[in-house]
Amino acid sequence: MDNMELCEANNVPLTPITFLKRASECYPNRTSIIYGQTRFTWPQTYDRCCRLAASLISLNIAKNDVVSVVAPNTPAIYEMHFAVPMAGAVLNPINTRLDATSITTILRHAQPKILFIHRNFEPLAREILHLLSCDDLQLNLLVIFIDEYNSAKRVSSEELDYESLIQMGEPTSPLVENMFRIQNEQDPISLNYTSGTTADPKGVVISHRGAYLTSLGVIIGWEMSTCPVYLWIFAYVSLQWMDVYMGNSSARGHQCVYEPRNPLDMSHRSGPVHLMTGGSPLPAALVKKVQRLGFQVLHVYGLTEATGPALFCEWQDEWNRLTENQQMELKARQGLGILSVAEVDVKYNETQESVPHDGKTMGEIVMKGNNIMKGYLKNSKATFEAFKHGWLNTGDVGVIHPDGHIEIKDRSKDIIISGGENISSVEVENILYKHPRVFEVAVVAMPHRVWGETPCAFIVLQKGETNKEDDEYKFVAREKELIDYCRENLPHFMCPRKVVFLEELPKNGNGKILKPNLRAITKGLVAEDEANVIS
């Protein structure tokens, strides 16, 4: 049987853009997108994507060309996730919270042929173009504005805009047929830049195959039912969720875009609301608060380099018999690999041996599978480091519990080494989140003359717990209260020796806390016990 060859009939490259074609054929009356008063069916979305792809091809967009987009959650950015790869190109969604300098850095590196930008960001576009014009190497960039659908505002006849491209597109039958026939499933489908909380962002290249299999893995792992309604409250620019909104088309679901200015009313829901959350590890105390609001929480772990969600907390029926607090502790774990993850492990960096499954011994989380990126664009050194020893080295520190579930403990750069002992900043944060005064917390290492490093907690208090007229004595008393609370719930060497109160924590465009900024602040701080030693 080894000599049986693959052929065109039995070897069709995998790509998630086929989800769209199938949805339009199978569910002609099913809603695909709800955006304010705008409604589209799957055939309408399919037609718009085909027209947009045809227009891109007419603009000489070809295989592996990069198309960048800066836009909020709108039907346009959803359509581009299908239409751009249908034209053979690579979509590069850019975070709208980045400033002009950061976006210009990405554009210089990605070298896109087209930049789509929402009309709301027109001043930002002018600043970006000014910065690009100062370069020695000119980027020949076509800028196309996106206006709201059915907007009365239209650009001049000399400018191209998004809706005009769709109207002008002529998707002939042969052209459409070729749109869904990619040459190689390992061809790139998207270029996403990491959030860059610890360094300059890197361009992560994802394949059609990786996006396809991860989409199916997410749908199966989340137990997404048929005809789901998916409410988008996170930016479409994040690869972490690309798999869900592309895969949702295969489940004949539809997308709802949530506008943050409007309160989220859950009073009219007809069934349970399932909430998927990822990013930084979610404290059990926060899971408990969210579930009491009526959500069913699914905790996931993912990263851009793994095409988004990679581990799910796989709920076991016997856990339903546990107390609420015990259940929340289990839900706070990140869990097991999804379908597209072949293997996941936690290993010692020095020996590359697996850590014991005791829920205590920490190591680096590593994984391999069809979900893993192709590599970093134009950065072979970083790609080599990421794939050392035949695994994707995530840079995240975790443990494996006796039941095989993985729990993240920290980023490797956020581990605090005090007197030779490794301290998980996340573990300390989880304890502080249980204190009724604490709204938000981040724990980082601060220098210590005796122990080398010691934990320092930066805390935002709950509303009503502080005001500008509070005197220093009140803050000192609160600091002592929180340190004593940690000493009651943690080994003393893990407890913060300094607490700093802030009105808000510094965050990047994705909402991740910028711990390097906080570590910089600690260089000017002195722990109380250290002050006694110095004196």
Swiss-Prot record:
Write the record's keywords in alphabetical order, separated by commas. Fatty acid metabolism, Ligase, Lipid metabolism
Q: Please describe what this protein does.
A: May act as an acid--thiol ligase that activates carboxylic acids by forming acyl-CoAs.
* Family affiliation: Belongs to the ATP-dependent AMP-binding enzyme family.
What name has this protein been given in UniProt?
A: Probable acyl-activating enzyme 22
- Ligase is among the record's keywords: yes
Q: Which organism is it from?
A: Arabidopsis thaliana (Mouse-ear cress)
One GO MF term on file is: ligase activity
Q: Which Pfam families match?
A: AMP-binding (PF00501), AMP-binding_C (PF13193)
Gene, per the UniProt record: AEE22
